[in-house]
């Protein structure tokens, strides 16, 4: 009986994220759910910047209120707290998500705040590894590729109730920039890597049936003056597109995506290092056993083009094309029940450790093994 319950429950948890949240309040059209997790996590690596304790906790809530029979208000907040530093350490916690919105029956929903960019609608299909993954080109606060500030998002499910399985989203991001180099700046100025000008994006996904889905997304943003004048990528627009496929049925999960970015993707440890173009590929294959074990095999890569980057001793004139991310990943998660799990994730770095480009640009070529024990609710 336990195996059957796990077989039904675990895929639902993976798909819904906080679907197993604890209901705090549900009365008179008002509902509040609390969710969170504690991850006792340790990395093993020859890279001292990664090796060691990585433990953290996350806490969030989702709420909604029924305004009338056609209109619902909602909001979500999620916070991350690191647990691997001293109590006197600074900058060890941050807000991951914080947005509020309105849902208009079959006409869709609109929200504003800190939320996922629409590129992640497709990237999320392959970002399913136990610990690693989702990093060929997506980064938090890098335009609309991951979690981002100041995004207004309209989402529509089943195309106004007319086409089952056809979903789309339209998104606008306001500028977030520092006051320098002729920029007036905004009240939440940040370093050049995390700046962005005004931008927009759209995504669409379609459930093809029998477990198959297809999707695509596109974004285009203005770059700030700092980004145009003080990074290796000189274009005044940052663009990205992606397309993906997934299969999720019969305990099997398969997903793949391809994407390209222009004047957008940072690499290495220098604010100057932004690729003029990247070509990115991710694929993952997973199987959910009835007794709670979920093994996963994945491959991710990002090829940088026209980098104009330091090449190190091997390439004193600099380099233009180079792999920025390239690794295979073997992992497994075991679910004791819906609240407790443990996992191992082995990131096999395929970047050439003998290539001086990586040391010159602060890009690790070392493998990492992650071990985690998770309590979630």
UniProtKB/Swiss-Prot annotation:
The keyword S-adenosyl-L-methionine does not apply. Residues 175-189 have a biased composition (Polar residues). GO terms for cellular component: cell outer membrane; membrane; pore complex. It is found in: Cell outer membrane. Coiled coil: none annotated. It is a multi-pass membrane protein. One of its GO terms (biological process) is carbohydrate transmembrane transport. Keywords: Cell outer membrane, Ion transport, Membrane, Porin, Signal, Transmembrane, Transmembrane beta strand, Transport. InterPro entries: Gram-neg_bact_OMP, Gram_neg_porin_domain, Porin_dom_sf, Porin_gammaproteobac, Porin_Gram-ve. One of its GO terms (molecular function) is porin activity. Residues 175-196 are annotated as: Disordered. Residues 1-21 form the signal peptide. The keyword Disulfide bond does not apply. Belongs to the Gram-negative porin family. Forms pores that allow passive diffusion of small molecules across the outer membrane. Non-specific porin. Homotrimer. This is Outer membrane porin N.
């Amino acid at each position: 009986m336990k195996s059957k319950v796990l077989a039904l429950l675990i895929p639902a948890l993976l798909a819904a994220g906080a679907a197993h949240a604890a209901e705090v309040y549900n009365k008179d059209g008002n509902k509040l759910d609390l969710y969170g997790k504690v991850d006792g996590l340790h990395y093993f690596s020859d890279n001292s910047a990664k090796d060691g304790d990585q433990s953290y906790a996350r806490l969030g809530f989702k709420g909604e209120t029924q305004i009338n029979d056609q209109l619902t208000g909602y909001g979500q907040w999620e916070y991350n707290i690191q647990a691997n530093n001293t109590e006197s350490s600074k900058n060890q916690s941050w807000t991951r998500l914080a947005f509020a919105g309105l849902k208009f029956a079959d006409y869709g929903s609109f929200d504003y705040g800190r939320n996922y960019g629409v590129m992640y609608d497709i990237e999320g299909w392959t970002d399913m590894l136990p610990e690693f993954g989702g990093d060929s080109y997506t980064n938090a606060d890098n335009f609309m590729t991951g979690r981002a500030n100041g995004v207004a998002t309209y989402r529509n499910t089943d195309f106004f109730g007319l086409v089952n399985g056809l979903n789309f989203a339209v998104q606008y991001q306001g500028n977030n920039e520092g006051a320098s180099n002729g920029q007036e700046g905004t009240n939440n100025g940040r370093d050049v890597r995390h700046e962005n000008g005004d931008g927009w994006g759209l995504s669409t996904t379609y459930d093809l049936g029998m477990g198959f889905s297809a999707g695509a997304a596109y974004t285009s943003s203005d770059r700030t003056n700092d980004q145009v004048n003080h990074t290796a990528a000189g274009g005044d627009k940052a663009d990205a597109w992606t397309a993906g496929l997934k299969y999720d049925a019969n305990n099997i999960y398969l997903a793949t995506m391809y994407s390209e970015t222009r004047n957008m993707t940072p690499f290495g440890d220098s604010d100057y290092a932004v690729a003029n173009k990247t070509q990115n590929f991710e694929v993952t294959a997973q199987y959910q056993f009835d007794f709670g074990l979920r093994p996963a095999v994945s491959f991710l890569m990002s090829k940088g083009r026209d980098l104009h980057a330091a090449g190190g001793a091997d390439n004193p004139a600099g380099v233009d094309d180079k792999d920025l991310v390239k690794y295979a990943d073997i992992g497994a998660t075991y679910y004791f029940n819906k609240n407790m799990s443990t996992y191992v994730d082995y990131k096999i770095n395929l970047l050439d450790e003998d290539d001086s480009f990586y040391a010159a640009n602060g890009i690790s070529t070392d493998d990492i093994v992650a071990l985690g024990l998770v309590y979630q609710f």
